[in-house]
Amino acid sequence: MTQPCIISVAITGSLPRKRDNPAVPITVSEQVESTQAAFEAGATLVHLHVRNDDETPSSEPDRFARVLEGIRKHAPGIITQVSTGGRSGAGRERGGMLSLRPDMASLATGSVNFPTRVYDNPPDLVDWLAAEMKAYAIKPEIEAFDLSMIFQAVAMQQAGKIDGALHIQFVMGIKNAMPVDREVLAFYVHTLRRLAPDATWTGAGIGRDQLTMARWSLELGGHCRTGLEDNVRLDKQTLAPSNAALVSQVAALCEEYGRPVATVAQARALLGLPSMEIDGRSPW
């Protein structure tokens, strides 16, 4: 059977504002509604940042708690993944929401240049975030911005800092970081298969490269990420009307490439996560 494709939706991010696209969900209710619609369109994993009311990035655990509660109610079974990225807090503040026990959390295993700053991930912070994820039984999604981050993730797994099979997200298209290049992506995938044969991976392209990365990921056996965090446009002329519209676009690509869109149960099994119910009870 052809492997199903997990569609991840990054609904908000830290950067897009309403002025960029009015559909960017900012409030708790907007984020819950946007996730529900994306879920109904085929997304089985939601990547979460939260915002303050003035649209600035936040790492406030209470806000994460309210979003997670709403998503678990209105998109039952969807894989919840919180961001520990550096725009919404400093140091250990970035992991303040991990005690809420989402299914997954992002973990960058090294530092990288971004358009106007360094995305700083010093080893002691990376180790602390990984330890918190392990303590709360949260599966990390390794954010790989270059090749070294794959090797670092494997080393952390071998040292017992990360449990279970790795899940890597290859991020391409951020200015000053790795550009979108199919040969590089293919080498990343080859390297990952050599170092961690049981690992899974997702491709994430930024802006106009979002669909290009989705196509390559489908061809190479990976999974796909979409959403207004990475790209506010449906095409060159059209703003995306919703996260659900972007998910539908990727779902159509899955059909084109003969990759069925993963169900919640399939996505959880592929990532080694608990099923929707444990002993007849919700895992939450």
From Swiss-Prot:
InterPro entries: Aldolase_TIM, BKACE. One of its GO terms (molecular function) is 3-keto-5-aminohexanoate cleavage activity. Its EC number is 2.3.1.318. It catalyses: 3-oxoadipate + acetyl-CoA = acetoacetate + succinyl-CoA. Keywords: Acyltransferase, Metal-binding, Transferase, Zinc. Its cofactor is Zn(2+). The keyword Metal-binding applies. The keyword DNA-binding does not apply. Pfam families: BKACE (PF05853). Belongs to the BKACE family. Catalyzes the condensation of 3-oxoadipate (beta-ketoadipate) and acetyl-CoA, forming acetoacetate and succinyl-CoA. Is likely involved is the degradation of 3-oxoadipate through an alternative pathway, within catechol degradation. This is 3-oxoadipate:acetyl-CoA acetyltransferase. It comes from Cupriavidus necator (strain ATCC 17699 / DSM 428 / KCTC 22496 / NCIMB 10442 / H16 / Stanier 337). The lineage of its organism: Bacteria, Pseudomonadati, Pseudomonadota, Betaproteobacteria, Burkholderiales.
